[in-house]
């Protein structure tokens, strides 16, 4: 008997067999757990991550920030709206290229990032306590390979 799936089968494939489904499921679970820990500061882990990326880059262009976060620009713009509304980030025209926009943290945003970092560290510690420090480090390395440009290129080549 063959292990090949039956085309048109009404039974969906096991999500643990599909790499994409397994990664999405794990991402949702980890996001839920981190969001719970970050809730007292009013941020979700996705918002915390955006603030971290902006802080590291200074005042990145939208294109550079989207690339660093592996997001398309429209998704980034959508995710920036609540951060801008709450006064954590400021959008401005690039002085060297008026067609491009840059984003930077406000003072309020820097304070919110400092507050969320403490909670994020707690979430990190909880993850490593539950999953194991060495396994967590190995997981981060494996995931870094997967979200690299080199992996995307190799994948697109088939």
What are these regions (language model features)?
Residues 1-41:
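N-terminal leader segment of winged-helix/HTH proteins
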Residues 12, 151-158:
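Short, charged, intrinsically disordered terminal tails
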Residues 31, 59, 81-145:
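Charged, amphipathic alpha-helical coiled-coil/dimerization segments
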Residues 40-41, 54-57:
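Short helix-capping/hinge SLiMs at alpha-helix to coil transitions
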Residues 41-47, 75, 106, 131-133:
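Short helix-coil-helix linker/hinge
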Residues 50-51:
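Short alpha-helical "packing" element that flanks the helix-turn-helix/winged-helix DNA-binding module
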Residues 57-60, 71:
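The short coil/loop that forms the "turn" connecting the two helices of the helix-turn-helix
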Residues 66:
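The alpha-helix within a helix-turn-helix
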């Amino acid at each position: 008997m063959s292990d090949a799936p039956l085309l048109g089968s009404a039974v969906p494939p096991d999500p643990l067999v599909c790499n994409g489904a397994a990664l999405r499921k794990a991402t949702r679970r980890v996001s839920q757990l981190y969001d719970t820990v970050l809730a007292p500061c009013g941020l979700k882990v996705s918002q915390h991550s955006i603030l971290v990326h902006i802080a590291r880059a200074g005042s990145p262009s939208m294109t550079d920030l989207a690339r660093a976060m592996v997001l398309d620009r429209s998704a980034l713009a959508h995710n920036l709206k609540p951060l801008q509304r709450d006064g954590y980030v400021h959008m401005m025209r690039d002085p060297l290229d008026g067609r491009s926009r840059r984003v930077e943290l406000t003072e309020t945003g820097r304070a919110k990032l400092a507050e969320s970092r403490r909670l994020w560290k707690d979430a990190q510690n909880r993850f490593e306590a539950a999953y194991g420090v060495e396994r967590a480090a190995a997981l981060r390395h494996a995931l870094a390979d997967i979200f690299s440009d080199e992996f995307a290129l190799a994948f697109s080549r088939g």
